[in-house]
C-alpha cells in the first residue's frame, strides 16, 4: 500500500461524489444506443492483496455497468498484477503478463515505479485508480478523440471451449497517428468473487468485473490509405470460466505511445 490515509480518504470522497452522479445518470445503454458513443478503454491495474484496491474495483464496476459518462462507451479491463502475491495472499486472477503490461505504461508515463490501484484511460492518461473525479475527466476527454472503427462477430464453434471470432478493423484515417499500431484481442470475465483469507484484505469478500483472462496480439492495424483489416480468430476458453459472463474485447494500440486508437466489446456467443 503506497498511499497515505489522506489520499485514501480523498479517493473515497471522489467515489462517493461520482456515485451520487451515477444515481442521477441514465440507465445502462442498450447495445443499439451504445453505437452512438465513442469507445473508451479503461484499464485498472489492481490486486486482491492491496487494501486500497477494492474501492477502485468498485469504481470500475460502476463505470462499466452504469455507463455514466455522456458520449462514452466504457470498455473495461481489470488486470490483476502479481507483485502483491508475496504478502500472504496469492491473487488467483493475477498474471506476470499484466505486471509487464503495467510496467510498459510506467515507462511510457515516466513513472518511478508501478503502483496499485492504477487506472489508465485510452493509454493516454493515468492516475490513482480510486479517484473517480479524475476518471470522469479522463474518460470525457477520451470520448472526444477520433477512433478507428472496429466490429466483432462471434460464432459458436463445434467445441464448447472455442469461439470463432471475425474482427473488422477500419483504417486509421480518422486517428491522428504516424506510427505502427497493433490489434489485440482479450477475454474478460464478470462476476468473479474471492473470500480473502490473508494479507491486507483479510476477511473481505471481493467482487470483480471485466477481469482479464487472456490477451493476445493478432495483427497490425491498416495504415491510413489501406483497406480495412479482416481477421478470423479462434478464441479458447477454460472450462472453469462461466461462458455467460465472458466478453471478447478488441482494441488497437500504438506500439510506441501506447495510445488506444479504437476498441470494441462483445458478449461471447452462446
Describe these PLM feature segments:
Residues 12-21:
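Hydrophobic h-region of N-terminal signal peptides that target proteins for export
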Residues 21-115:
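Active-site-proximal cofactor/substrate-binding loop regions of enzyme domains
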Residues 1-11:
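Bacterial N-terminal signal peptides that target proteins for export
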Residues 90-118, 124-270:
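Short, conserved sequence motifs used for protein processing/export or organelle targeting and
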Residues 14, 39, 124:
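Generic anion/oxyanion-binding catalytic loop in active/binding sites
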Amino acid at each position: 500500500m503506497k498511499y497515505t490515509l489522506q489520499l485514501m480518504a480523498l479517493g473515497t470522497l471522489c467515489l462517493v461524489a461520482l456515485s451520487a452522479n451515477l444515481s442521477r445518470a441514465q440507465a445502462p445503454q442498450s447495445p443499439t444506443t451504445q453505437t452512438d458513443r465513442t469507445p473508451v478503454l479503461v484499464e485498472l491495474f489492481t490486486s486482491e492483496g492491496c487494501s486500497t484496491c477494492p474501492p477502485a474495483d468498485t469504481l470500475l464496476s460502476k463505470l462499466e455497468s452504469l455507463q455514466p459518462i455522456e458520449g462514452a462507451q466504457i470498455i473495461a479491463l481489470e488486470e490483476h498484477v502479481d507483485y502483491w502475491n508475496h504478502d500472504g495472499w496469492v491473487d488467483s486472477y493475477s498474471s506476470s503478463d499484466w505486471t509487464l503490461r503495467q510496467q510498459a505504461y510506467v515507462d511510457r508515463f515516466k513513472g518511478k515505479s508501478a503502483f496499485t490501484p492504477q487506472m489508465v484511460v485510452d493509454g493516454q492518461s493515468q492516475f490513482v485508480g480510486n479517484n473517480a473525479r479524475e476518471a470522469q475527466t479522463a474518460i470525457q476527454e477520451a470520448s472526444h478523440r477520433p477512433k478507428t472503427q472496429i466490429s466483432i462477430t462471434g460464432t459458436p464453434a463445434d467445441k464448447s471451449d472455442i469461439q470463432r471470432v471475425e474482427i473488422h478493423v477500419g483504417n486509421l484515417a480518422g486517428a491522428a497517428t504516424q506510427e505502427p499500431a497493433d490489434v489485440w484481442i482479450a477475454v474478460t470475465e464478470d462476476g468473479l468473487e474471492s473470500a480473502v483469507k490473508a494479507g491486507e484484505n483479510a476477511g473481505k469478500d471481493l467482487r470483480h468485473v471485466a477481469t482479464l483472462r487472456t490477451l493476445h496480439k493478432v495483427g497490425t492495424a491498416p495504415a491510413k490509405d489501406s483497406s480495412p483489416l479482416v481477421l478470423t480468430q479462434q478464441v479458447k476458453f477454460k472450462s472453469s470460466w462461466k461462458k455467460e459472463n465472458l466478453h471478447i474485447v478488441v482494441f488497437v494500440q500504438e506500439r510506441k505511445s501506447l495510445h488506444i486508437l479504437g476498441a470494441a466489446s462483445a458478449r461471447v456467443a452462446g
